[in-house]
Amino acid sequence: MLKKCVWLAVALCLCLWQFTMGTALAAELTPEVLTVPLNSEGKTITLTEKQYLEGKRLFQYACASCHVGGITKTNPSLDLRTETLALATPPRDNIEGLVDYMKNPTTYDGEQEIAEVHPSLRSADIFPKMRNLTEKDLVAIAGHILVEPKILGDKWGGGKVYY
């Protein structure tokens, strides 16, 4: 009988802990977290929570098969971390840079167009998931890519060691 009471008390404590601490452990989508660079001139934009969540959904739909967790399966040395995006030519660490890339992708050094091998609006005939994406959708996806490092830290683009 005592064992049953102890297990019941433990289960009750775990349930209470989950209800009280569950939301405290979740990432807060504050305006600071949702504020990301708009362009390379230093302007910023604050996404709405709805934009961020839509970007996350669209990223899962159109991008995550190759970029799950911010990595690049086809080229592990190029991830979606902010630092990596900033070093690209042209820089892709802002909304406009990422949207431009999703329209017409180029190599990391910016020398060659790679629309034939990387999904983009330009190659929507080859990559059907890109067909129905609008400019608004691309902004939401770019916003998601730029917000994730603020939420996940080193896990975003960190690879297998974090999953």
Swiss-Prot record:
The keyword Thylakoid applies. One of its GO terms (molecular function) is electron transfer activity. It is a peripheral membrane protein. Heme c binds at H67, H118. The keyword Ribonucleoprotein does not apply. PROSITE patterns: CYTC. One of its GO terms (cellular component) is plasma membrane-derived thylakoid membrane. Residues 1-26 form the signal peptide. Disruption phenotype: Cells do not grow photoautotrophically under low CO(2) concentrations. Binds 1 heme c group covalently per subunit. PSII binds multiple chlorophylls, carotenoids and specific lipids. PSII is composed of 1 copy each of membrane proteins PsbA, PsbB, PsbC, PsbD, PsbE, PsbF, PsbH, PsbI, PsbJ, PsbK, PsbL, PsbM, PsbT, PsbX, PsbY, PsbZ, Psb30/Ycf12, peripheral proteins PsbO, CyanoQ (PsbQ), PsbU, PsbV and a large number of cofactors. It forms dimeric complexes. One of the extrinsic, lumenal subunits of photosystem II (PSII). PSII is a light-driven water plastoquinone oxidoreductase, using light energy to abstract electrons from H(2)O, generating a proton gradient subsequently used for ATP formation. The extrinsic proteins stabilize the structure of photosystem II oxygen-evolving complex (OEC), the ion environment of oxygen evolution and protect the OEC against heat-induced inactivation. Low-potential cytochrome c that plays a role in the OEC of PSII. Belongs to the cytochrome c family. PsbV subfamily. This is Photosystem II extrinsic protein V. It comes from Thermosynechococcus vestitus (strain NIES-2133 / IAM M-273 / BP-1). The gene is psbV.
